[in-house]
Amino acid sequence: MKIVMTIMVRNEEDIIGENLEYHLNNGVDHFIITDHHSTDGTMDILREYERKGVADVRIEQSEEHHQAQWVTEMARLALSKYDASWVINNDADEFWIPQKGNLKDFFHTIPQLTYKIHVSRFDFFYKFSKDLKFYDAMLFREFQRRWTKCCHRALSDISVEVGNHDANSESMNIQGYGSSGTVDLIVFHYPIR
C-alpha cells in the first residue's frame, strides 16, 4: 500500500515542516505539493523534502486560485506517477490522526468497495502566547463538528471539490463503490497561527 498526500501551500513556513514530518512518521510515503505565491521561507523547506525524494513540488503562478482544479491534478498524479493506493488531500494546517496505529494501519481496515472516506475535523484556537509552537498554544478545541475532510483511493478520474471536503469518481459510482464516514481517523486543524 502506498499513501500519497497532496497539499496546497502559501506562506506556510511556520507549520509545513512539522506537517510533513508528522505525516511521514505516520505512514505517508510521498507528498505532491503545489505552492501558490509563497513569499516566506516555505519554498526553502519544500525543496529540502524534494531533495530527500519524498516530495514533488509544483509552482502555480496564476493570479487566480483554482484550488479544486490543482488538487484534482495532484490527486490524479498520485496514481499516474507514484502508483498510490490512497490519496489524502490535505491543507498545511491539518493533521490526520488515526485512533490506532498509523495511517497505513487505518487504510488496511477499509472495505474494498469503499472508495472515499469522510473524516471529522476539529478546529484548535489559541489560549496562550503566540511565542509557543502552534500545537502547544492551541489548547482550545472546538467540539462542534466542522466540514468533514475527504480522502480517497487513487483513481484516474477522481475530481476533488474545493476545500478537499469531497471527491467523486464517475467510474466508481457506476460500479457500485461507495463512501463511508469514520471515527477511527480524525483531522486536527490549526487555522489561526
Tell me the role of every PLM-derived stretch.
Residues 1-21:
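N-proximal low-complexity "stem/linker" segments adjacent to membrane-targeting elements
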Residues 7, 34-42:
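Ser/Thr-glycine-rich phosphate-binding loops at phosphate-binding pockets of nucleotides
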Residues 21-30:
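Short, acidic, metal-binding catalytic loop of nucleotide-sugar glycosyltransferases
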Residues 29, 85, 115:
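Short acidic/polar active-site loop segments enriched in Thr and Asp
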Residues 83-97:
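Short beta-strand-to-loop acidic/aromatic patch adjacent to the donor-nucleotide binding site
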